[in-house]
């Protein structure tokens, strides 16, 4: 019998693997007491599925105007990459809690204008389980958007409502879910296409708009990942 690598070293071997994206892997390694040769940082292309990233710029400095201009491209991206013959889930990240609610309403407004008010709903509205879950939703606006296939999350909704949204989204009944950037580490859902609507948030402490931390962007992009279901993934960065 040959010796294993762990039996030939003088100190115990410890492996710490992180599935979240980091911008300071070397600092984390030093904090854990590892020297640089024992810290491994994998490139973004080392992921279970190939990812196509699409970037669209907006030359508008006024935040509200820029977000308003992004509504139609977000809707179009859902239709284009979310699929028509084979609808696939779309996860949309927005800068704020208020924006998550308003964007959900905007998506339904555009669907209604296209004459397909429930194009994002992929379950029989009369299905007993679906009706029961909708009746349990406490937020009235959320209940109305879910009935048409669009859910949204933010820190203000109840834990029960959040679980219902995640359940309907993961089952495929609801195709679209809008989430504020601040919750990107809290959710447990993934999608075929991730759309990042703007890359700045308002810092209330200093009353300025700041760019998203690169770690947050990488984490949001990483949620376009369903290796057991899809063969590839898409991300749209606005």
Task: Give each language-model segment a name.
Residues 1-13:
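Short, conserved "post-DEAD/DEAH" coupling segment immediately C-terminal to helicase motif II
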Residues 10-16, 88-91, 149, 173-176, ...:
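Loop/turn-to-beta-strand initiation segments
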Residues 12-14, 189-238:
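Conserved segment of the helicase C-terminal RecA-like domain
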Residues 18-22, 94-97, 179-183, 198-199, ...:
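A short beta-strand-to-loop transition that corresponds to the Sensor-1 phosphate-sensing loop
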Residues 25-36, 182, 187-192, 225:
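Short regulatory helix/loop adjacent to the ATP-binding pocket of P-loop NTPases
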Residues 94, 98-176, 204, 209-215:
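Conserved C-terminal RecA-like helicase domain
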Residues 12-111, 151, 155:
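Conserved interdomain linker/interface between the two RecA-like ATPase lobes of SF2 helicase motors
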């Amino acid at each position: 019998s040959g010796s294993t690598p762990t039996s030939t070293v003088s100190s115990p071997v410890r492996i710490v693997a992180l599935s979240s994206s980091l911008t300071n892997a070397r600092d984390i390694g030093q904090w854990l007491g590892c020297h640089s040769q024992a810290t491994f940082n994998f490139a973004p292309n080392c992921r279970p599925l190939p990812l196509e990233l699409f970037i669209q710029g907006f030359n508008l400095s006024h935040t509200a105007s820029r977000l308003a201009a992004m509504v139609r491209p977000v809707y179009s991206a859902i239709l284009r990459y979310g699929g028509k013959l084979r609808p696939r889930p779309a996860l949309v990240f927005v800068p704020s809690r208020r924006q998550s609610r308003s964007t959900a309403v905007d998506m339904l407004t555009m669907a209604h204008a296209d004459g397909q008010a429930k194009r994002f709903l992929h379950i029989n509205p009369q299905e007993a389980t679906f009706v029961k879950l909708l009746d349990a939703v406490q937020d009235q606006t959320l209940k109305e958007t879910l009935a048409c296939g669009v859910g949204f999350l933010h820190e203000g909704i109840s834990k029960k409502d959040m679980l219902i949204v995640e359940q309907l989204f993961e089952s495929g009944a609801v195709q679209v879910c809008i989430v504020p950037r601040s919750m990107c580490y809290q959710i447990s859902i993934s999608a075929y296409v991730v759309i990042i609507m703007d890359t700045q948030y308002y810092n209330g402490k200093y009353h300025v708009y700041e760019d998203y931390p690169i770690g947050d962007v990488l984490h949001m992009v990483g949620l376009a990942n369903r290796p057991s279901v899809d063969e590839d993934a898409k991300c749209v960065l606005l």
